[in-house]
Amino acid sequence: MNFKIYNISDQAKGNFNSGEILENKPIGFPQDGGKLKPYSNLFYWAHAWTNNKKSTVGLHPHRGFEICSFVLRGKINHFDTKLKKWIPLSKGDVQIIRAGNGISHAEEFDKNSEIFQIWFYPNLEKSLKKNASYDDYSFSDFKIRKNDKSSTTIIKGDGSPMRMDTEGLIINIHDLKDGSHLFKSTKQKIHSIFILDGEIEIENKNILKGTFINISQTDSFEIFCNKKSTIFEVISPLTPSYKTYA
């Protein structure tokens, strides 16, 4: 099993508007200086939040990528040049911009709000020729699978309405009770996991809130929770079938 840990200190840092919006970036831009570079069909992953003041990232352009925002806490408002109106999003909601041949957007963070923004690689040779499109998904749109030890919100995968052109993605949020949890995989997949809350253990290594890990080249792995924990998981191809520039 290939298992790597990226602590908060290993992640790139960023901010907007003189620190009104703060960021840790498990996968940053090349100039950001974090330890982890793009891989699989993941190009960029930012964990962004505000404290006691709302703040806006002004209108800026995108092309090619599929850019997803996952609202973890609070509220954001989104504007783009496709819909030409502000759209509110709350905790648990997800937005996707299929940037295609070009779109510009702006984001307003309410105070005490928190998101992931993740850029995924579709096949750029195809996506750059498509018109841009945009969808919002409410938390209530997503299927939740429960058992005695965990609850899993399926954001992208079996039974999810979320449409993406990026190949081979599964996106889950797992709420895990204390104890042992077995995750199945294949050697063709890589699991990218962010610890949203709590504390977990893998191969006798203690992993705290805010830490990012990836796991690959295994048919299964075990996560032990020392207490109730929440993790955000993206499963993607170890080697996509198309060029990604990663």
Task: Describe the residue ranges of each PLM region.
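Surface-exposed beta-loop interaction hotspot
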Residues: 96, 106-163
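Hydrophobic secondary-structure block in the mid-to-C-terminal portion of proteins
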Residues: 160-214
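Short, conserved beta-strand element in jelly-roll/cupin
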Residues: 61-77, 119-123, 173-176, 186-201
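Short acidic-glycine-tyrosine-enriched beta hairpin
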Residues: 80-98, 201-225
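A short glycine-rich, His/Asp/Glu-containing loop-to-beta-strand
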Residues: 15-59, 66-67, 115, 141-182
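Ligand-binding loop in jelly-roll beta-barrel domains
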Residues: 99-126, 206-208, 216-245
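Short conserved micro-motifs at the rims of enzyme active sites and ligand-binding pockets
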Residues: 183-185, 243-246
